[in-house]
Amino acid sequence: MDRGSKRRQVKPLADSLLDALDYDSSDDSDFKVGESSGSEGTGNGSDEEGSKESAAGSESDSDAAAASADEEGIDDLETKDLNQEDDEEEKVKESFSEETSSKETGGSSRSRKKGEKSSDMEPNGSATTEENSAEPKKWNLRRNRPMLDFTTMEELNEMDDYDSEDDNDWRPTQGKKKGKASSGKEKEGSGEEDDDDDDGGSDEEDNEDDNDDDDDDDDEGNDDESSSSDSEEEGKKPKKKAGKNTGAFDEEETNDSHSTSHGKGNEDSLLERPQTWSSQRMEHILICCVCLGDNSEDADEIIQCDNCGVTVHEGCYGVDGESDSIMSSASENSTEPWFCDACKNGVSPSCELCPSQDGIFKETDAGRWVHVVCALYVPGVAFGDIDKLRPVTLTEMNYSKYGAKECSLCEDTRFARTGVCISCDAGMCRSFFHVTCAQREGLLSEAAAEEDIADPFFAYCKQHADRFDRKWKRKNYLALQSYCKVSLQEREKQLTPEAQARITTRLQQYRAKAELSRNTRPQAWVPREKLPRPLTSSASAIRKLMRKAELMGISTDIFPVDTSDISASVDGRRKHKQPALTADFVNYYLERNMRMIQIQDNIVEQKNLKDKLESEQEKLHMEYDKLCESLEDLQNVNGQLRTEGQSIWSMMGGIVGQKLNVPAVLKAPKERKPSKKEGGSPGKSSSLPAMLYSCGICKKNQDQHLLLLCDTCKLHYHLGCLDPPLTRMPKKTKNSYWQCSECDQASSDEADIAMETLPDGTKRSRRQIKGPIKFIPQEMSPEPKKPQVRGTRTRGQKRKRMSICEEEKMEEPLPRERRQRQSTLQKKPKADDTRTECTTCKGPGDNENLVRCDECRLCYHFGCLDPPLKKSPKQTGYGWICQECDTSSSKEEEAQEVEEESVNEETAEQEIPD
């Protein structure tokens, strides 16, 4: 049977298209060569097969067509049409000769495929071969579909009787072809799941028919000749790149990824296809706003509202799976828009359980709105229909939970006590937070489906939540928020006006239906007794009040809300209660007024008592001053009598001729050094009589309990007179003491020298910045405001008289000049203070590892101290003495006490004989 007879049996274009679309790929194995005489081209590789057939019989096509026309009685018009078809096949052959030559150099796998293709056209081109006629062969109908005269997807869509929805097994491919290049496009979308049309790596085709290998060797030479002869004309034919199909992606991902070109141009175009598909796939990833999951399955699909763009699982929202669950963007076969309950009712709801305004809502039986996630996680919330999660019932929950706890995760503290807060499910944890706040931080969890738990929804705080689960949930939440912000704008741009009008019309129908059902449904049951609820627990009320304050010009920032959870005061009564129209708040308000009256009366009584005590203190101070004057007179008389007694005692010793022991009465009393115990520490009584000390700054002697002794200058200061003022007494330890700011300023030069040895000067510069600025102008001022009297002693002069002689005082009458000279004299020896040797171990050292005692002036290593230290025990504002000096001072105090006791005993013995 020659080629001309086959050409006469070519079907019309419409019939060929219907045959191609109704074709079932599962019947390939039963299709014989003899049954395929009705079609000439192929669907997937018709261009290639046609080119190879024309290459095998390019010289005798016209003769064979004429002979067949004479035998069958075809008229001249039919012969002319067949000759035109011959010319078209020759053009197709020339356009694909380069691809055929490239396949020849592809390896053994390519040669097998070409051999099979040559064996397919061998029964058509040479009918004289007995082996081919005697043995029928199978062929792949997907590779030999009728050749279509369409080059782009748009031309197919223009046909009235074509429906792209039903053609799930067909997709045009792209490639640089001319003329009938659409046959190459059909190859990718023809439902082909094997690798027959790939680069030549098909092993299944060889296994199906082993006899094809013998024919491959026989016909390989013919293919080589035809491809080599046509390769010269390949450069003259321009190529066109077919338009890329950017339709909805579906489950044909494997076909798209496995379909490869047979030329370099097709390879480049196919490399762009997976990238485009992956970018489209990433753009369509949806996240459920209830569980934050992104897994969408057929049984539980993620659907999206066509109005507000919110995304949710069907199971998470209680969609029944009927027509209302089909959404235009959720499935490629869906045509009905879907809307959430809030959009159906045409409201912008506010949740009653939390301050968040995002997410998806459900309506309560009382006409309020709550988040679905809030209704699932808040204890006490019930559903009328468990499967559909509606309506939500809030009456079963105790109303005392509203505003009872403060949310620890709220971004705006003004909404921290709105709604209902849940607690952390980790044992005795006392963390409370809103459900949506916990969802924002990724703290919500849900038990697995196989676990049988009464309440499968639980939440943990940041401390007890799993770090990895929290991380991916937090990312999904942020991705969901960013997607919701841009989804509406993108959808409006992508939708056509007709689709937008269809969605708007459908939404109006839903809203009319919802309005009708709202008016006809029975009224929900509510308890007879009205339950009070704090107004401040409603987030919507707080927003309206804030808006009112803004319109009135009142700033809400100047009224900070004190939400500290202090349940009771010192006397056991509640310190603060949220304002509400309840009996508890009324009782609290009345009790607070009574307490305020009592406190005010107490303040008046304390003021009167203070005035009375101050008047008594003034009288006592006057008596004290008189006693001090008499004490000075008695001390002078006592000194004179002591000197006379000593002279008489020495005279008596001279008369006796031997040295007599001077009695304790005639001995001059030693000046007792004030110890650290005299700094006002309670519970330590001294043998000396109590004295009233005056402040070194204000020169007043009131508030003796607030006077602090400086261990360097031995002056007392009020805590409030210091710079900066102190709020409590400084702590004095065993080996440290306290000094005032001016003494510390003078002794800080030693620390500055040590700081200079550090590698960086950060601490030194910081030390210089911290120095008090108010003392610098006093030292640098050239003229003093008021000359100081020589006998007086002020705060600025308390260290001048310690290291200055009388000659310097005569030479420098002005105190300001003495101050400058004294500071110079004091700094010189401290600048030369270099510590080189440890007193304990006699080892070398420097200022970085040695510390000097402020009394004995000896140096010690930090590690040689008892106990050893890692850093200097000298702190800023405090001095330091070694352990030996501290022990010796305590021994001196004990010896002095013993001596005083002995003096008292001798005095008592001398008074007895009298």
Swiss-Prot record:
It holds the Pfam family PHD. A zinc finger (C2HC pre-PHD-type) spans 348-381. Zn(2+) 7 binds at C710, C713, C740, C743. Residues 792-802 have a biased composition (Basic residues). Zn(2+) 2 binds at C305, C308, C340, C343. Zn(2+) 9 binds at C853, C856, C882, C885. The N-terminal region, including the PHD-type 1 and 2 zinc fingers and the C2HC pre-PHD-type zinc finger, is required for binding to histone H3. This is PHD finger protein 14. It comes from Danio rerio (Zebrafish). The gene is phf14.
